[in-house]
């Protein structure tokens, strides 16, 4: 198996095709990248910016460059000695435009007789054997249907007609009644849908890749990539949606000839990948959470908790109660169709009614501490969730006791489907709701993180990295992705608030006075986001504010927006640009946070790039990138600027200040090059401790062994507190051999070396043992 040393994620779309990606390969190679990492490239919904709505898995998307474009990327990568990692989406396909998806079109036209009927997860027993499509403004809109060009039309929506169901002059409403599908009002999707989706997205229909024939057809193009040596590895999107993730990975490993595989699996604290999973690890959110938290000041927790409580009227937020509520909001709302389907699968001899079963199943899911179980290994997790659900709702105890053995029986469809459903609820209830409500420090509410873990001390951080080296050395590490709520540099700046909680509280109170918003917790989220991403355009901040408010769902929401509140929200954001006093407050806050945020950014980047695992660089983040949630994190950027800056660095033109964005490029390029060119320096993991008054502000580790020292990473943590306490002073680190800083070229040691000398230019350093000819 070929494995990567590092990757660089590129978002492939119509505006940046595979041919464009091929042209970036020389720059990526110069940057030090080992593998090119591509977003989904199979044919997707026309105009899709992300590619996760695949409509035809049999071909590379023509809009994205087609098979010729993929061949161009692969050829360029091979010429540079690089590999290719590609993102694939086995869980679902895009069905927004049925005519673009031949599988879905066939299903709608032929129903159960379609060759693709088994490919989709349809409950045919509901709705009289028809597929319910929630596309109408209301059920009354059936009168708006038309027959045109041999198709059923609803405004711009087109649907096929089954053979023999239409004769000239037939009323469209009557023709509709004869189809294998039923068009319904969009609001009915919450309770009456009968096909599995990706989360609550009606236009993404679940696919049953657990069926061998479906797997084969869905992966024929993917298999070609490996047969023709176009790709080296795969990133698997949303494996938790699959009926049998373990079986899927085993089959995928076989058909790709033993390729490198990563899964987009979010691990909760303490959770481990099942040993039976044939993959190299995750896409790195677990690493992101660890890196963020070691740069957060634990002393900020108490004052930020107090502030959060005051914003809630004096009562502190109980996170477990909160997520129980937000998950029930999802099970009883946008995913209730899925819960009802589970309830219909409960055997009659269990003596549990549909209503009681749905309530009990939802309560068990709300008690889940992880996204899903993988039975039989996860049996204890399921049992504990059942116990917690019964304690919370004693009146459901009998139903829960009846359900537990059924949910543990892997031969039952109920158990398999329950496992597919719990992850959806976790994602929507926690990531997409609670993370917009629990706002004491925005850094903590990131994908894959547990926001109740406020900070991680260095000794615990080192223990986690040592485990990573021992157990998952080929798992990905990351700081920014297309899914992160805030980019790495936005979070790094927000993290400084943990060191200046008092100043933050005063600034927030002034901003709330100047631009009132009747939702205290949301105001904290909003002003932290603005401070973290500043400078930003009015349009970006308005979009983020509205999305955050609707996701939180307290003062407004997506299905029933609150115009009065949203107008106040808009006014608060406008005030940043139109009210000099508000703008002055924001700029003063940013001025306070920025230098320490830049230090945090460099520390996080160097640590992530050199820690155990396979580091990924998300496109463009070798420069400062202060993005917010999608689609803000997919904005266009210039490779030309980065290429020119890298050439300047290589010519010896180093940044004069560590706040210069070229410093981040310097750190990124030197770390990536070293990992690629000197792999022998990254074979182990040993914590390195400093001595002296500021030892706690140094995070350092040696990637070698006791017998053979390797690359030595040194990074500043809690830089504001360091400055306030008088700086590094006599704090020193012991070097066993002479070493050179890859960032500056300066030499140090052997012996005790002051940290202030090592960090004379930048708040981070990457030291390597000097060879005999170096001085």
From Swiss-Prot:
InterPro entries: Glyco_hydro_13_cat_dom (IPR006047), Glycoside_hydrolase_SF (IPR017853), Maltooligo_trehalose_synth_4 (IPR013797), Trehalose_TreY (IPR012767). It holds the Pfam family Alpha-amylase. It catalyses: 4-[(1->4)-alpha-D-glucosyl](n-1)-D-glucose = 1-[(1->4)-alpha-D-glucosyl](n-1)-alpha-D-glucose. Keywords: Isomerase. It comes from the Bacteria. GO terms for molecular function: (1,4)-alpha-D-glucan 1-alpha-D-glucosylmutase activity. Its EC number is 5.4.99.15. The keyword Isomerase applies. SMART domains: Aamy (SM00642). It is an enzyme of class 5 (isomerase). One of its GO terms (biological process) is trehalose biosynthetic process. Catalyzes the conversion of maltooligosaccharide into the non-reducing saccharide, maltooligosyl trehalose (alpha-maltooligosyl alpha-D-glucoside) by intramolecular transglycosylation. Monomer. Belongs to the glycosyl hydrolase 13 family. This is Maltooligosyl trehalose synthase.
